[in-house]
Curated annotation (Swiss-Prot):
Lineage: Eukaryota, Metazoa, Chordata, Craniata, Vertebrata
Bilayer topology term: Single-pass membrane protein
Topological domains annotated Mitochondrial intermembrane: 29-95
Chief localisation class: mitochondrion
Compartmental location: Mitochondrion inner membrane
A GO CC term assigned to this protein in UniProt: cytosol
GO MF term set: cardiolipin binding; phosphatidic acid binding
GO biological process, one term: cristae formation
Listed name of the protein: Ubiquinol-cytochrome-c reductase complex assembly factor 3
Signal sequence interval, chain numbering: none
Length: 95
């Protein structure tokens, strides 16, 4: 009998916790108008930011393609933007 009582109590507490969690989630979730406003404020909406992101992706892809085509460890370069073997020796570490 006490086991049944404990199980019912645990079930009631879990149900109450789930109810409180659901209520809090409903309170903090933005409405449809706020969602639309947030989407308009996204950085990708601005052409300059879009172009900058596209350029960054192009540079990353070019670096990955170069790294795949060479045996050099491009991560050790002092200037990643420069091509060729400009590692400089030592990878920028000093004793």
């Amino acid at each position: 009998m006490t086991t049944l009582r404990k199980l019912l109590l645990v079930g009631a507490l879990l149900g109450a916790g789930a109810g409180v969690g659901t209520a809090l989630f409903a309170l903090v979730t933005p409405g449809e108008e706020r969602k639309q406003a947030m989407l308009k404020e996204m950085p990708e909406q601005y052409p300059q930011r879009r172009d900058e992101a596209a350029r960054t992706k192009e540079l990353l892809l070019a670096t990955l393609q170069e790294a795949a085509a060479t045996q050099e460890n491009v991560a050790w370069r002092k200037n990643w933007m420069s091509g060729g073997g400009g590692g400089g020796g030592g990878g920028g570490r000093s004793a």
